[in-house]
């Protein structure tokens, strides 16, 4: 894969939040104070493999919002 490709994360409404490079790290912040780092691989403009699971990026944001997990570049 091209290392210059970016993964553009959005909020649950589809508004762009930030981008990370392909194979970059995402930090997940849980309500109990725990943090988890996930490796992200770009699949296409709207899909990524996050911690080994394929997601549509808008669906990932909705799932994180539902589970009260915030996320940011690591």
Question: Can you annotate each of these PLM segments?
Answer:
Residues 1, 7, 24-27, 38, ...:
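Generic low-polarity alpha-helical segments
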Residues 1-17:
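Mixed-charge, Lys/Arg-rich low-complexity intrinsically disordered regions
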Residues 53-74:
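Intrinsically disordered, low-complexity, charged/polar segments
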Residues 21-54, 58:
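Acidic, low-complexity, intrinsically disordered interaction modules
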């Amino acid at each position: 894969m091209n290392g210059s490709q970016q993964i553009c994360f959005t909020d649950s409404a589809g508004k762009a939040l930030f981008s990370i490079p392909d194979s970059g790290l995402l930090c997940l912040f849980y309500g109990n104070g725990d943090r988890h780092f996930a490796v992200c691989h770009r699949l296409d403009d709207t899909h990524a493999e996050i911690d080994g699971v394929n997601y549509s990026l808008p669906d990932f944001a909705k799932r994180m919002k539902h589970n009260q997990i915030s996320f940011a570049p690591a």
